[in-house]
Amino acid sequence: VVDGPFAVINADDYYGVNAYKMIYDYLSSGEDNEKYRYAMVGYMLSNTLTENGYVSRGICDTDENQCLTGITERTHIEKTKDGAAFTEDDGKTWVPVALDTTVSMNLFGFTASMLKELESRFSAFLTENLEKNPMKCEYFLPAVVGDLIGEGKAEVKVLKSADRWYGVTY
């Protein structure tokens, strides 16, 4: 049973020592107030790219206080001679992305309130999605985070890491 702050990571990723310290320090420094108080470690896109093809990354938008306002998933980002670019039409057109763009690699820090939110939304998610495509029905954590931000219930501080991120599996 989780009754305090906790971090969520992808099991097959290496985030760097500094990322864990930042999440720990943030979660240790306060509690929920009028909004849920969450955090996400953000990385520079350049520190998450591979030489082996393309990657999927969540491009982060933040406000003046470095709080997350949205994540846009880009499923095909590649290194280019000028930096990086993404495509949404199988390479017919490419849109440049700055190498210092902040991306999410799914390292989040939450208070116990997140578990209540996930549980309260899960039944509606299944009702809405399971019938459409049961083999691909996936409850995406960043989607719930985005919903909570949009509803004004949560504030997600983006903690910027200079560490290099590594995917352990390929």
What positions do the PLM features span?
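The conserved acidic donor/metal-binding loop of glycosyltransferases
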Residues: 11-14
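Short aromatic/hydrophobic "clamp" motif used to bind/position activated sugar donors
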Residues: 6-7
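Catalytic beta-strand/loop signature of glycosyltransferases that borders the donor
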Residues: 101-102, 157-163
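Active-site-proximal specificity loops/subdomain of glycosyltransferases
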Residues: 1
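Glycine-rich, charge-dense phosphate/pyrophosphate-binding loop(s)
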Residues: 170
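Conserved active-site beta-strand element of glycosyltransferases/polysaccharide synthases
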Residues: 109, 156-159, 167
